[in-house]
């Protein structure tokens, strides 16, 4: 018999994935050009030519044993350092390779950090509407996802409700900015309010509350809209990122976590 937890997971399996599979089925019948797929975030923009050239060069120039061999659990040091320096240049941060952990996409990163911090029965807060897989990610490790109800006029956080939901059992808050599915971007003022509430609650309750910034859509901000980098506003912040959207590479599953030195137990 399979585990009861897995039965429940399969029973509530991803609607997004089900829609994707149904889209594939319909495309075979009516032609892909006649089916509009709004399920998975599969970009319809090709990956940059530079990505394809880099892949070809690596395959041609790297020794096969090295290319296909095991690596450090955290990823290649030079790749992690390059990411750290890119972040420092863009966001005026002070990271180095030790703050970067390569992951299998943003989903792999979120599962990694949640497994690291959650004890069974602890709660993770997020703001509705949210990416549906969050509930599965949290439940994978015995946690409970608690959603702040949406302000359907603006889709901005309802801070009064958020503050009331934080308790001794709260382990983390997931913020998806820009948000999936609404596309809303939380401004610097909004992030500052969020950080202040979390800091005050940490002191009041005598616990560590982690802020998990889920950022696969960071580059999809237009018309001069700026997306705040959350590590600059709250010390206990971990960032999860993926190149799936920014470089149109969802199938490659390339992501990373940023774990600043200031995060509790960062080592």
Regions found by a protein language model. Give the residues of each.
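Glycine-rich "substrate-gating" loop/helix at the edge of Rossmann-like oxidoreductase active sites
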Residues: 6-11, 149, 182, 244-245
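Short catalytic/ligand-binding loop motif for oxyanion handling, primarily in non-cytosolic enzymes
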Residues: 44-48, 181-184, 219-220, 248-250
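Short strand-loop junctions, especially beta-strand C-caps/beta-turns
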Residues: 41-43, 178, 242-243
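Walker B catalytic acidic pair
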Residues: 215
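Residue-level marker for buried hydrophobic side chains located in beta-strands
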Residues: 177, 211-212
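N-terminal small-domain helix-loop-helix segment of the aminotransferase-like
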Residues: 2-105, 112
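Conserved core of the PLP fold type I
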Residues: 60, 64-206, 218-233, 238
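Conserved core segment of the aminotransferase class I/II
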Residues: 235-267
